[in-house]
Design a protein with these regions (language model features):
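Short acidic-capped amphipathic helix/loop micro-motif used as an active-site/signal-coupling element
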Residues: 53-58, 82-86, 167, 249
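Catalytic core of bacterial c-di-GMP phosphodiesterases, primarily the EAL and HD-GYP domains
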Residues: 73-148, 229
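Catalytic-core regions built around general acid/base machinery
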Residues: 119-125, 151-159, 213-217
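Short, basic/aromatic recognition patches
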Residues: 2-33
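Structural preference for long, well-ordered alpha-helical segments in enzyme cores
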Residues: 68, 81-88, 119, 152, ...
Length: 285
């Protein structure tokens, strides 16, 4: 058996700082747009969480999520992010925007017994937002659903909550099976799709499905394809040629902070408001 090592003083300090920031509710949301192709009109915002330490340092998920997971706080974190995202969605609705908000759920939380059921109760408190919040789950989680997960997802689906598959590591999927689960958006890495398109027959996802047919095969099942991590300009025309309807990445706009009063956050320095977002994001695109 591998030996257990004691955490270093630096690791203990980082855990303490992250825990303090979380308990002080210093979670901040940034929004990154998902745009239509080829016209780059904003259709969707993905809510991306950050955690601000007491000294002002802003941490990305890769820096704090493993620590929250290790301390059993991941599901509480996801619920807080969802509540903030619901506030953002309500703000968008009040402004007459048709954009929806995607909320990432961690694999750790999804695996926790009762977590998905708790989301149904949370979303039931705001029936006016049904259809405006998309729950995003990683590919790995979708591939390892147990009976309880499926039952909870069925309840959410019946309430009109759309789902998205993201954090894909390959291009293999069954459009019919995804639709049966209630998935309405599917995020695939732009570089993997482009790499597959450069092959002789494009048959990356299986013997019957060519990457050039991804968008149409998904559309027939009511699923919209999103190319993610579109970070280079020369990717865009290739994705357009593949018929990809939606895309996300730094070539259009990076994540930008939301005003704290919109998301119900503690005050943070130099945020921008959703009323500014369309201008800023379209300029970036």
């Amino acid at each position: 058996l591998p030996s257990m090592r004691n955490p270093s003083a630096e690791e203990v300090s980082r855990m303490r700082l992250v825990t303090q920031a979380f308990e002080a509710d210093r979670i901040e949301l940034h929004l990154q747009p998902v745009v239509s192709l080829p016209h780059t009109k904003i259709r969707f915002y993905e809510a991306l969480a950050r955690l601000r330490l007491a000294d002002g340092t802003l941490l990305g998920p890769g820096e704090f999520l493993p620590l929250l997971e290790a301390s059993g706080r991941a599901s509480d974190f996801d619920r807080r992010v969802l509540i903030r995202s619901m506030a953002i969605a309500r703000h968008l609705v009040a402004r007459g925007s048709e954009a929806i908000v995607g909320v990432n759920l961690t694999a750790h939380s999804i695996a926790e017994p009762g977590f998905l059921w708790s989301l149904a109760g949370l979303l039931d408190t705001s029936p006016d937002l049904l259809g405006k919040i998309v729950l995003e789950m990683p590919q790995h989680s979708w591939r390892h659903l147990d009976a309880d997960h499926r039952a909870a997802l069925a309840i959410l689906r019946e309430r009109g909550v759309p789902f998205s598959l993201d954090r894909a590591t390959d291009l293999r999927f069954d459009p019919v099976a995804l639709a049966d689960l209630g998935i309405r958006f599917m995020k695939l890495p732009a570089d993997l799709m482009i790499e597959a398109a450069e092959q002789a027959d494009g048959r990356y996802a299986g013997p019957e499905l060519d990457v050039r047919d991804f968008a149409s095969a998904l559309r027939r099942q009511g699923i919209r394809l999103i190319a993610e991590r579109v970070d280079e300009g020369d990717m865009v025309p290739v994705l357009c040629d593949l018929g990809v309807p939606l895309a996300q990445g730094f070539v259009f706009a990076g994540p930008r902070p939301v005003k704290p009063e919109v998301a119900g956050e503690p005050m943070a320095p130099q945020p921008f408001g959703l009323e500014d977002a369309p201008t800023l994001l379209r300029r970036a695109g």
